[in-house]
Amino acid sequence: MAINTSNLCSLLFLLSLFLLSTTVSLAESEFDRQEYEECKRQCMQLETSGQMRRCVSQCDKRFEEDIDWSKYDNQEDPQTECQQCQRRCRQQESGPRQQQYCQRRCKEICEEEEEYNRQRDPQQQYEQCQKHCQRRETEPRHMQTCQQRCERRYEKEKRKQQKRYEEQQREDEEKYEERMKEEDNKRDPQQREYEDCRRRCEQQEPRQQHQCQLRCREQQRQHGRGGDMMNPQRGGSGRYEEGEEEQSDNPYYFDERSLSTRFRTEEGHISVLENFYGRSKLLRALKNYRLVLLEANPNAFVLPTHLDADAILLVIGGRGALKMIHHDNRESYNLECGDVIRIPAGTTFYLINRDNNERLHIAKFLQTISTPGQYKEFFPAGGQNPEPYLSTFSKEILEAALNTQTEKLRGVFGQQREGVIIRASQEQIRELTRDDSESRHWHIRRGGESSRGPYNLFNKRPLYSNKYGQAYEVKPEDYRQLQDMDLSVFIANVTQGSMMGPFFNTRSTKVVVVASGEADVEMACPHLSGRHGGRGGGKRHEEEEDVHYEQVRARLSKREAIVVLAGHPVVFVSSGNENLLLFAFGINAQNNHENFLAGRERNVLQQIEPQAMELAFAAPRKEVEESFNSQDQSIFFPGPRQHQQQSPRSTKQQQPLVSILDFVGF
């Protein structure tokens, strides 16, 4: 009896070795049905029922583990994994035990899918998927397969979400462009007819194109005069309406369609004006500069970023807060209307609208340093859009640099998906704008030569002021932060119907933008005269040409701009139904002066000796003096319509000047 027991133990030992070798073999290849049957047959040779049950259970377990579950997982469309898994079980698994295990796994997949679909955010879906893997998988190999499936789902959902976001952005852009076209057509119903006429001219031979375009302009001119005769209430005289019709030929004029939306969310948008040098070579002095307009809703937060450009900010309306990171030091400033502040290139900064009711409007003038006329934003934080630049580094680099696991980083980078301008709670706004003891520069002296804080234009006396208008300007000698950029910032408020100028800048070229109201602009330009034939006629040598200046006209509305080159005489007329508010950024500002060509004071023509004026005009001295010395006002004057309508006794009825300090935004 002892011998039989010994033989049985030996047999069981050999069988265990056989089963172990079979397990290793089966783990390395797809499960073989014949081997499974052989495994069960060997179990049947054992003497006790308990041994047989345990042996068969081991065979079943190996069978379950060696099913290739990847063939039941749809890697491309996780939404249909449940149905496809069940269908493949019915098609490919014939044995009842195989069907049982296959259906059980499919049920788990279906439950996972149901819970997965309840989550809308890819990051939440990913986390839920990982929990399922940890809960139901015990074998490392299966755990890895499950986690890989989670990764594939996560990446696919991210791509789908990004695609939806981009489609929504395009839809918003198209609606915005369509709305702008509708507004433009309402403002200028004859523009389409003029553009059609010009397109027909372009189809003609080159010799005939110029005459054809002149005919188009003449037709528009006649339409404009006719419109004034039929509707005498229409703003401006006939000659001012002509400028509106010729704006498409004006390289200095930028309408609102010249603004492209850089970022747009429900809480605000950032727009950038067309590249100056890309518009015309006449604007080559501005090839390194760009104009950006920002608008943010109450309690909005603009994500941290840095630019590869130096920036000068002007607060047009609202109340904000600016945080700038200089190396390892944070500087914090409250911003008010009229504040000017510089953000050096590479400085990480972020903005907050700290007002509960009013929108924040900021104009930024950028001096590019990497690529002329081109700049980029770099966001350290974000999610889907903007994508944080940190996410472009490999996970090994990020783990080493931040000493943080990839799973945690993925959770951080995947959360924000509302865009560049987002809404913050009032509690968050209070926390962001409170007097932070760690910030050594909170409310440092405002303005001044040595300050890095904001300089407020309205803290100084107006540069020019009378009942027809006010002007304020900060120059490099006033604010040290403007010196190495050689820029100036200018704001003017012109009362309804009044005008500023004519005048010219001695050195500075300025980008002038309408913040409120409407402006009729006229400028004398010697560069455009050759394009229309000039008065000289023929192609003669440059120094032999007759001197001729083209009259450049433009009708500017809110958010539209015009470039005034140095030396070019210009005049701005407030032509709308409200006061005109202008702001301007000027380059080459050091030692620049405005030379006015009319008025009792600051009039350069009055400084020319009477004999010289008499010789220059070839007219009697008395007539010259009467022509140039009759204006009692300076800088700001009654406009053309006021001049025609007002008698000397009615000057007291002039609309009173509304202070520029009363203006609160676009």
Curated annotation (Swiss-Prot):
Localization in the cell: Secreted
Primary localisation category: secreted
Keywords recorded for this protein, A-Z: Antibiotic, Antimicrobial, Fungicide, Plant defense, Secreted, Seed storage protein, Signal, Storage protein
Entry-linked InterPro entries: Cupin_1, RmlC-like_jellyroll, RmlC_Cupin_sf, Seed_Storage-Functional, Vicilin_N
SUPFAM superfamilies in the record: RmlC-like cupins
GO cellular component, one term: extracellular region
Alphabetical list of Pfam families matching this protein: Cupin_1 (PF00190), Vicilin_N (PF04702)
Compositional bias per record (Low complexity), positions renumbered to this chain: 642-655
Domain annotation Cupin type-1: ranges: 271-410, 455-625
Keyword Secreted: yes
Stretch forming the signal peptide: 1-27
Molecular function terms, GO-annotated: nutrient reservoir activity
Annotated GO biological process: defense response to bacterium; defense response to fungus; killing of cells of another organism
Entries under CDD domains matching the protein: cupin_7S_vicilin-like_C, cupin_7S_vicilin-like_N
UniProt KW Signal keyword: yes
Residue segments, region Disordered: 161-191, 219-254, 629-655
Family listed: Belongs to the 7S seed storage protein family.
Function: Antimicrobial peptides 2b, 2c and 2d have antibacterial and antifungal activity against a range of species.
UniProt name for this protein: Vicilin-like antimicrobial peptides 2-1
Record organism: Macadamia integrifolia
